[in-house]
Amino acid sequence: MRHRKSGRQLNRNSSHRQAMFRNMASSLVSHEIIKTTLPKAKELRRVVEPLITLAKEDSVANRRLAFARTRNIETVAKLFNELGPRFAQRAGGYTRILKCGFRAGDNAPMAYIELVDRPETAAAVEE
């Protein structure tokens, strides 16, 4: 029975799910906005928010914990050098999920997940 088991299975085994969320977390940290299905975005939020909270206090131990969860040095560097200081005064709620319709092939609900306080892109600044 699955009583009180949190998290979505997403029709994947545990290692596939873990690898997928590692990759998606790295993509979200590097690009600061990604488009994915709504259930994946909601689960990704549970992975990324604790990483940013960890990055608010820069220490070797916290960097090692973040690396153990992401397995990506560039992601860890951006977390601790940019995102940690940016969200230092914010007590949680670092991500925003915006619904964006349905996918053409299978009608799956799609969503953008982005980091709040994301700097505007260069194209938007020029306009």
UniProtKB/Swiss-Prot annotation:
NCBIfam families from the UniProt entry: L17 (TIGR00059)
Sorted alphabetically, the keyword list is:
Ribonucleoprotein, Ribosomal protein
HAMAP family recorded:
Ribosomal_bL17 (MF_01368)
Q: Indicate yes or no for the key word rRNA-binding.
A: no
Name which cysteines form disulfide bonds: none
One GO term in the molecular function aspect is: structural constituent of ribosome
Q: Which GO terms describe its biological process?
A: translation
**What is stated as this protein's family in its record?**
Belongs to the bacterial ribosomal protein bL17 family.
Quaternary structure annotation from Swiss-Prot or TrEMBL: Part of the 50S ribosomal subunit. Contacts protein L32.
Show the GO cellular component annotation of the record.
cytosolic large ribosomal subunit
NADP among keywords: no
Lineage: superkingdom? Bacteria
Protein name per the record: Large ribosomal subunit protein bL17
Extract the coiled-coil ranges from the record: none
Name the InterPro entries for this protein: Ribosomal_bL17, Ribosomal_bL17_CS, Ribosomal_bL17_sf
